[in-house]
Amino acid sequence: MHLTDKQIEDYKNLGVIIIKDVFKDWIEPLRLGFQKVLNDPSKHGRENVTDNKGRFFEDYCNWQRISEFKDCIFNSQAAQIVAEATSSKSSQIFHEHIFIKEAG
């Protein structure tokens, strides 16, 4: 998958583009990775509990220990899309950050 010239121009002008179905094959593997993080959070993992119903959990910097995250980073089209959208020769991951908000 390559971005169109219009998508690249839209990204430059708007800072955002919608690309449908690019990551659909990654949903289930990433869901498994999220569950692994929930079962074994990193030192950055936080449960943000308030009087509101519904759990809110966040964690980050797990891509090196959660194989599903690392696999997506290195084997999905994410890096290529970012490089094309920004007209860069490469892209670099700083860290991933997950947020899980349950209903309520």
What are these regions (language model features)?
Residues 1-13, 20-104:
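Non-heme Fe(II)-dependent double-stranded beta-helix
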